[in-house]
């Protein structure tokens, strides 16, 4: 006997209506490039009876429309990592999206309050909390502006600059902070807290590094696809148009967790010296003999020199070149035509082809060089990233290859490689502050680099840590001069330029919403309040007669 009486027919009809609504939703042009491995019925079964509309989905629609326009025009949305409400309100005047960096959050905003480098070892609600912080600020300043404008006449509004404070936010989901269920929960957090899009990378969660650190460990291709599917599943369950950005760190990766996915086989390094013990055994024996630190490193270096480490196709080419084979170049061409970075040939198939061409079982052991943590050695590169990006494309709105340098030729190689299979795929580019921009290119080239990338299809570009660096520079300059010349530093280097440039934060009480709150108080008290923050005696009256842009 059920606790609550329910009309089964009405329940079934409601379910079927919702399934039909989801199917209709998925027919929208926004989803024409998206692959789903489940049905609308599967999704509706996972929903509750109360459907909540999340404003972040409206922001996602706005973001998608914005990027569509950039794609048509061969332009780009370019932005940077925001730290706080000051950043987002100032960015909103000039930039059309906002980025939230896991790196910045790790160093400045962990929910544990413990600073850290970018290892994604902070509590997994850290970036969602920062997202909510900035999203609430956007909503507040939008309300404040709306209230101020509608205290004006239409003629006054026409003369008053308008700022769209609701710039879509794209946030850093790192590796998802765990398995599939963790990713689903993390995605829900981002949807609830204002994200229009999130990005997730193909590193292993326990060893995640900043994209510009060494020692990156990848997960197999299918494991990352599962993450992308998990994000879309969560977004579908919660009725969100959330954009998914798939990042690959394979360009500079050196390790892989597993050989299970044949699409990774081409890039796995093996030993070609059959007389050596596996490295892990050699290192264990050295430790048992009491060797430490430098001596252990020497043992590993000696083993590595003797191992003949290479990729399987390199071992095949070396065998053909060193052996007694007629038509060597023809043999190499036949092998490399069928086994190449984008062929997704399994090692078993590659071995069979090599034996057919050479008559030999070529020795190649990818187990022997495994590092002490158990990972396989891996040789990434641009074509490796292209191969992964092609696999991720059906499950992601945007693809991002993390790179070591701001190299246009490499960016073009990646874009061309992805678009050869997926011509309409949107791409993203990290204009990283880890690059030495003044060594990488001329000042003139710096000015046009974003536009050059946009023409290749990089529709969303961002400086991950510009919020951090601009804040550091401004505070360092002011603190140094303040120590030397006192209030002259503030008056001449901060306040005067604020007034001259029309930076509204110079009237910080008004910027923070004091007038808006006063008007709320008056609304509640019938129009009169003796405790108005901006009443007689407020010090911002000193700025009223200032001949400025404010």
Curated annotation (Swiss-Prot):
Keyword Transferase tagged: no
Keywords per UniProt: Glyoxylate bypass, Glyoxysome, Lyase, Magnesium, Metal-binding, Peroxisome, Tricarboxylic acid cycle
Major subcellular location class: other
Subcellular location: Glyoxysome
EC number of this enzyme: 4.1.3.1, 4.1.3.30
Pathway note: Carbohydrate metabolism; glyoxylate cycle; (S)-malate from isocitrate: step 1/2
Residue numbers binding Mg(2+): 172
Pfam families in the record: ICL
The keyword Magnesium is annotated on this UniProt entry: yes
Molecular function GO labels: isocitrate lyase activity; metal ion binding; methylisocitrate lyase activity
Catalytic residue list: 210 (proton acceptor)
Catalytic reactions on record: D-threo-isocitrate = glyoxylate + succinate; (2S,3R)-3-hydroxybutane-1,2,3-tricarboxylate = pyruvate + succinate
GO CC terms of this entry: glyoxysome
Motif (Microbody targeting signal): 548-550
Biological process (GO), any one: glyoxylate cycle
CDD domains with a match to the protein in the record: ICL_PEPM
Binding residues for substrate: 101-103, 211-212, 247, 430-434, 464
Cofactor: Mg(2+)
Top-rank taxon: Eukaryota
Function: Catalyzes the formation of succinate and glyoxylate from isocitrate, a key step of the glyoxylate cycle, which operates as an anaplerotic route for replenishing the tricarboxylic acid cycle. Required for growth on ethanol or acetate, but dispensable when fermentable carbon sources are available. Also acts on 2-methylisocitrate.
Subunit structure and binding partners: Homotetramer.
Family: Belongs to the isocitrate lyase/PEP mutase superfamily. Isocitrate lyase family.
Protein name as it appears in the record: Isocitrate lyase
Protein's organism: Cyberlindnera jadinii (Torula yeast)
Phylogenetic placement of the source organism: Eukaryota, Fungi, Dikarya, Ascomycota, Saccharomycotina
Gene from which this protein is expressed: ICL1
């Amino acid at each position: 006997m059920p606790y609550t009486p329910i009309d089964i027919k009405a329940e079934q009809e409601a379910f079927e209506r919702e399934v039909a609504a989801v199917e209709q939703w998925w027919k929208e042009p926004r989803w024409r490039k998206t692959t789903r491995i489940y049905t609308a019925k599967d999704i509706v079964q996972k929903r509750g009876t109360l459907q909540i509309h999340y404003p972040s989905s409206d922001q996602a629609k706005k973001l998608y429309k914005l990027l569509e326009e950039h794609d048509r025009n061969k332009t780009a949305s370019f932005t940077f990592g925001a730290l706080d409400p000051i950043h987002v309100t100032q960015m909103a005047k000039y930039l059309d999206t906002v980025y939230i960096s896991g790196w910045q959050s790790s160093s400045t905003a962990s929910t544990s309050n413990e600073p850290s480098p970018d290892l994604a070892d902070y509590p997994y609600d850290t970036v969602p909390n920062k997202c909510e912080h900035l999203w609430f600020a956007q909503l507040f300043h939008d309300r404040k502006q709306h209230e101020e404008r509608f205290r004006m006449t239409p003629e006054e509004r026409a003369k008053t600059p308008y700022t769209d404070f609701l710039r879509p936010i794209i946030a850093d989901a790192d590796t998802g902070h765990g398995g599939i269920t963790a990713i689903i929960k993390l995605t829900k957090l981002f949807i609830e807290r204002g994200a229009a899009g999130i990005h997730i990378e193909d590193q292993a969660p326990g060893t995640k590094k900043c994209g510009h650190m060494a020692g990156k460990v990848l997960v197999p291709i299918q494991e990352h696809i599962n993450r992308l599917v998990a994000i879309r599943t969560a977004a579908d369950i919660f009725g969100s148009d959330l954009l998914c950005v798939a990042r690959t760190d394979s360009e500079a990766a050196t390790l892989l967790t597993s050989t299970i996915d044949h699409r990774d086989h081409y890039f796995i390094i093996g030993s070609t010296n059959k007389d050596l013990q596996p490295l892990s055994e050699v290192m264990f024996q050295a430790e048992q003999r009491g060797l430490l630190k430098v001596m252990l490193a020497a043992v590993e270096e000696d083993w590595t020199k003797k191992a003949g480490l290479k990729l399987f196709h390199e071992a095949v080419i070396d065998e053909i070149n060193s052996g007694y084979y007629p038509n060597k170049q023809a043999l190499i061409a036949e092998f490399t035509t069928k086994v190449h970075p984008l062929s997704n040939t399994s090692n078993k198939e590659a071995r069979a082809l090599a034996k057919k061409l050479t008559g030999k079982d070529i020795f190649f052991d990818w187990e022997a060089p495994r590092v002490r943590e158990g990972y396989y050695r891996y040789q990434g590169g641009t074509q490796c990233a292209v191969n992964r990006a092609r696999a991720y494309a059906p499950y992601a709105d945007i693809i991002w290859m993390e790179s070591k340098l701001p190299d246009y030729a490499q960016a073009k190689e990646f874009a061309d490689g992805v678009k050869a299979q997926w011509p309409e795929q949107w791409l993203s580019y990290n204009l990283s502050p880890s690059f030495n921009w003044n060594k990488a290119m001329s000042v003139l080239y710096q000015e046009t680099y974003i536009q050059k990338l946009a023409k290749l299809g990089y529709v969303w570009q961002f400086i991950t840590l510009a919020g951090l660096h601009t804040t550091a520079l401004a505070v360092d300059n002011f603190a140094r001069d303040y120590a030397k010349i006192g209030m002259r530093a503030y008056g001449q280097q901060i306040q005067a330029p604020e007034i001259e440039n029309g930076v509204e934060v110079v009237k910080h009480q008004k910027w923070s919403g004091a007038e808006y709150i006063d008007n709320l108080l008056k609304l509640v008290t019938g129009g009169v309040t003796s405790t108005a923050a901006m009443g007689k005696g407020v010090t911002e009256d000193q700025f009223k007669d200032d001949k400025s842009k404010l």
